[in-house]
Amino acid sequence: MRIAVKVGTSTLTHATGRLDIRRVEKLCKVLSDLKNAGNEIVFISSGAIGMGVGKMSLRERPTDMVTKQAVAAIGQCELMYVYDKLFSEHNHVVAQILLTGEDLREEKRHQNFSNMLERLLELGVLPIVNENDTVSTEEVAVGDNDTLGALVAVSVKAELLIVLSDIDGLYTADPRANPAAELIPEVPELTEAILCSAGGKGSSLGTGGMAAKLTAAGICMAAADTAKKKTRAGMYRGPVAHGAG
């Protein structure tokens, strides 16, 4: 099975922005085990800006574009160093792929990306994809890595997209602010009420949130309906969004 796995900054790091080593080690071990079982893994990982914030001991995520790009350049190096080291311990070779929105929107560049990623999978490599925050601007950015994960999953014809989060799933309200919020175990369709319950942006170090994850699920569901593929989208320990499969 070809599986796309997306992980966000808040899942990879502590609140300080520093890497949560134990969690990342466990994640790399699980993905390595899935690969050892014969699955093809495409790993979409946020975290460049968040790790750069931690490494530079900044108080908060920068808001101006130039500083965000600079911090991303710092953090991406450390992020890939950690992944290369941890996956190497399980005898897996990783490859770094950095994309902008134009790489997915422009037909020739999209095809080049798809061909290259297919070749990496043929070679038994574990591709690690992130948005190229060092050069991305509002005009060329994908926007958030939940959307990027969905677009990559559709592009590589993944049979399953798993979106990892620091929240157990979709709730009727933000469980961190409302103790009475209830888990929604299954989402048969993305209604206006469901989208409203998702709220806004997630952590202070990331760009996503539950709304972005629902948008990602919608992209996969639309692709499954259009192409009649068995693309399924869901959330780790959370609600299942139904696609064609």
Where are these regions (language model features)?
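Nucleotide/pyrophosphate-binding catalytic subdomain
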Residues: M1-A217, M221-A222, K229-A244
